[in-house]
Amino acid sequence: PFVRDEMTSPTPVSSTATEQTATQTTEDEADIVGAVGKTKEAVVSVTNLQSSFQGTDQETGAGSGVIYKKDGNKAYVVTNYHVVEGASRLSVTLSDGTALEAKVLGEDPTYDLAVLSIDSSKVTQVAKLGDSDTLRAGETVLAIGNPLGIFANSVTRGVISAQERTVPVDTNKDGQQDFNTEVIQTDAAINLGNSGGALINTAGQLIGINSMKIAEASVEGVGFAIPINEALPIMRDLEQNGEVVRPQLGIQIRDVQEFPSGYREDRLKLPDDVTKGIVVVGLTRNSGAEKAGMKANDVIVEINGKAIASFADLKSVLYRDAKVGETVKVTFYRGGEKQTADVKLSAQSPTVQ
């Protein structure tokens, strides 16, 4: 017998639901467009010009920057240190194409930040600062910059992948990772030339300075930005003082693991379970460490209760949690015995910690 196929009728789609979805999408897009509009003109291109053998200035690199302050006839731009490093002259190009000479007010290789000043007469927008401490994983963010040095004010969209990621970096280019940088991780595309550009939230607030990207073929969607709450105190120091004055113990050090096992056992006399720390190899005369009674071959394992496993840990604890003039409790081993010393911190010199 002939059997008739039973066709299932399609479920009616509510026109109201469709309208709501379309409205929601439009509202989301409006938020994004509005956020970009609040910041886009505050993002600039930064061109690094260096003297050639012929005596002329040649462009050696380009990056991005963000105008974060306007005061009288000056406007202030934050960018990455590596964008301006070695420049004999800097040019800042505004969003409308106006090129201005820029002056470096201060540089900080440790955090990869620099502050520039430019003439403010053509500046039409200043970035509004947000609060990077309130970021949540999954939150929508936008990166604005100058990718490849030729596509000014490009916008990419992504999310916060992680709000407190620690990335080891080599600040003095000696091949050793000597500082742990706390960064925002995002999957918003951050390409060559985006360095120094803005990472903003959907309110159009600056929440990070785009900095590093893991440049490996096998890694996609991994970009980093310096949280604005980390960057702001440094920006202020660079703007006002031209440098960041950081605290030091007054010691020269090496990581425990740089020493052969025989030296660790015979000279340092470390317990078997102590495999990480930093070894004092010298002290600055009249430094806080010397006055506190510390000596060569002391092995530091904690400062104010925070573990010190490496040079990078020491710098992170001192730079983030301490100030010049404060006293910190240093826990160390001497001759196999665990001891503590209260060390008053002084202003850092280039070769001492």
Locate each region found by the language model:
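C-terminal recognition in membrane/secretory proteostasis and scaffolding
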Residues: 1-10, 103, 136, 201, ...
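N-terminal activation segment of mature serine protease catalytic domains
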Residues: 2-56, 64, 89, 236, ...
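A conserved glycine-rich beta-strand in the N-terminal activation segment of trypsin-fold
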Residues: 26-34, 50-76, 98-101, 125-128, ...
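Terminal peptide-recognition signature
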Residues: 41-47, 65, 75-79, 102, ...
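Active-site loop architecture of trypsin-fold serine endopeptidases
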Residues: 50-59, 87-90, 124, 144-157, ...
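Short, conserved beta-turn/loop elements at beta-strand boundaries and strand-helix junctions
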Residues: 51, 70-72, 107-111, 162-169, ...
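Gly/Ser-rich catalytic serine loop of serine hydrolases
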Residues: 61-64, 126-131, 183-198, 280-291
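Conserved active-site neighborhood of the chymotrypsin/trypsin-like protease fold
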Residues: 67-150, 308-311, 317, 325-329, ...
